[in-house]
Amino acid sequence: MKKKVLVGMSGGVDSSVAAYLLKEQGYEVIGVTMQIWQDDEEFIEKEGGCCSLSAVADARRVANKIGIPFYVMNFKDAFKRNVIDYFVDEYMEGRTPNPCIACNKFIKFSSFLDKAMAIGIDYVATGHYAIIEKHNDRYIIKKSEDDKKDQTYALYNLTQFQLERTLMPCGQYKKSKIREIAKEIGLRVHNKKDSEEICFIPDNDHGRYIKNRFPNKVREGNFVDKQGNILGTHKGIVYYTIGQRKGLGIAFGKPMYVVDINPFRNEVVLGDLEDLLNTKLIAKDTNYIPFDTLKEPMEVEAKIRYSQTPSKAIITPIEDGRVRVNFHEKQRAITKGQSVVFYKDDLLIGGGIIEK
């Protein structure tokens, strides 16, 4: 009897080819687009985003083309609670969240998987560029064949339970090959542009998004230097992130960067590039893939943002499941709320959320 797999289809080329590859491998494939948009007007406005009307139409067209059933499943309440509300709360607290990591943790590999299992489906699948393998009795995640498209940074939260029930067929291919396969089988999405924006903020203006929803919470405040001297007025702390130089709306005669955000005083602290360089951080909410807990210091390569090349570091377990990370070289703009992710060569070790 064929194993059943529910494929999360965004209307993009990766998830489309993932569905095709799994069907070719002999699975009984069902395509699903997750409804996460919060109202109909928003849905129509997001033309081109991964949760827009055109995205659903693209996914449905692909499903018809490759001969699989297709459904839209409603995840909007879970998405609002676990991704949008978290996103807004983090910015209000002066931190910079990563909504894709939250979505993977709480929606794609939790709510979506739960729904799949509830209806008797064996696996869920996505178009992520990562490789899941079983070594002895443990599932591991390795970097994808395509270094430039590798998405393991956003997958460090996956549990053994989730990995056992998850398929990522695109991880074995380069992006160019995925596009080639899509073209060969006649998918119109073969040359569709990759989505790079936050899916629920297609114009990428997160400050305006939060201000529109919570106008009373976003207040002007002071830009200050490290000594607390007032330098000017900011639009609201949600508009800024650590390391930001452009868009401050004020000229200082020299480059100035956001080096800290104080939500209690509603202040944005500005400083020099040197003030952004650091070798240490502490991360919370950690998860490890090849083992359950980190018991002793470990040499790894670590990165503090998605697009960064990993740097050598030592990770040391501390209280409450936290981890101390000491980099060999100074890192620029270590940002609270973002994730730090650990590797050994191409093996994903784990990660956590930067606390300080």
From Swiss-Prot:
Disulfide bonds join C103-C199. The active site is at C103, C199. One of its GO terms (molecular function) is ATP binding. ATP binds at G8, M9, S10, G11, G12, V13, D14, S15, M34, G127. One of its GO terms (cellular component) is cytoplasm. It catalyses: S-sulfanyl-L-cysteinyl-[protein] + uridine(34) in tRNA + AH2 + ATP = 2-thiouridine(34) in tRNA + L-cysteinyl-[protein] + A + AMP + diphosphate + H(+). Residues 149-151, 305-306 are annotated as: Interaction with tRNA. GO terms for biological process: tRNA wobble position uridine thiolation. It is found in: Cytoplasm. Its main location: cytoplasm. It is an enzyme of class 2 (transferase). Its EC number is 2.8.1.13. It comes from the Bacteria. Keywords: ATP-binding, Cytoplasm, Disulfide bond, Nucleotide-binding, RNA-binding, Transferase, tRNA processing, tRNA-binding. Pfam families: tRNA_Me_trans, tRNA_Me_trans_C, tRNA_Me_trans_M. The record marks H128, Q338 as: Interaction with tRNA. InterPro entries: MnmA-like (IPR004506), MnmA-like_C (IPR046885), MnmA-like_central (IPR046884), MnmA-like_central_sf (IPR023382), Rossmann-like_a/b/a_fold (IPR014729). Belongs to the MnmA/TRMU family. Catalyzes the 2-thiolation of uridine at the wobble position (U34) of tRNA, leading to the formation of s(2)U34. This is tRNA-specific 2-thiouridylase MnmA 1. The lineage of its organism: Bacteria, Bacillati, Bacillota, Clostridia, Eubacteriales. The gene is mnmA1.
